[in-house]
Curated annotation (Swiss-Prot):
This is Transcriptional repressor NrdR. Keywords: ATP-binding, DNA-binding, Metal-binding, Nucleotide-binding, Repressor, Transcription, Transcription regulation, Zinc, Zinc-finger. It comes from Jannaschia sp. (strain CCS1). GO terms for biological process: negative regulation of DNA-templated transcription. Its cofactor is Zn(2+). Residues 49-139 form the ATP-cone domain. It holds the Pfam family ATP-cone. A zinc finger (unnamed) spans 3-34.
Length: 156
């Protein structure tokens, strides 16, 4: 593995252990050339997925991009990093198990929305505001009104 600090190709594995509920291997690496230390993760990839964007453009599925958007929605929320890793791994497995190599970006967005709604409402609303392209406060109000149960009516 190439060192991200100096580019040396001869790095050493100092520690390996299961991660993400045994669906990945976390490796701690050391570069003898610059003494840099870094971590890598090894995961099983069942198939190469291609994302079809709403404008028709196709691009390779990027787990890191998915992870970044989810972590941004969960920023400063009381969710353990391990739970986030498990959630992301579960979403990737679900996408791979669809049986298709081409996946609409809308499908990915809906899966993320579903998972975030189950673990944190604030993160769900944050993600929805970007995913559904909210433009004004009214967009938030409309979305939040769909989340809230209707107020009980009083019969007098």
């Amino acid at each position: 593995m190439r060192c991200p600090f100096c580019g040396n190709v001869d790095t050493q594995v100092k520690d390996s252990r299961p991660a993400e509920d045994h669906v990945a291997i976390r490796r701690r690496r050391f570069c003898p050339a610059c003494a840099g230390r870094f971590t890598t993760y090894e995961r099983v990839q069942l198939r190469d997925l291609v994302v079809i964007k709403s404008n028709g453009k196709r691009e390779d599925f990027d787990r890191t991009k998915l992870e970044r958007s989810i972590r941004m929605a969960l920023q400063k929320r009381p969710i353990e990093p391990e739970r986030v890793d498990q959630m992301i791994s579960g979403m990737v497995r679900r996408l791979e198990s669809l049986g298709e190599t081409d996946v609409q970006s809308k499908v990915i967005g809906e899966i993320v929305m579903e998972r975030l709604a189950a673990i944190d409402t604030v993160a769900y609303v944050r993600f929805a505001s970007v995913y559904k392209n909210f433009q004004a406060t009214g967009d938030f109000e409309d979305f939040l009104s769909e989340l809230r149960p209707p107020a009980p009516t009083t019969d007098t």
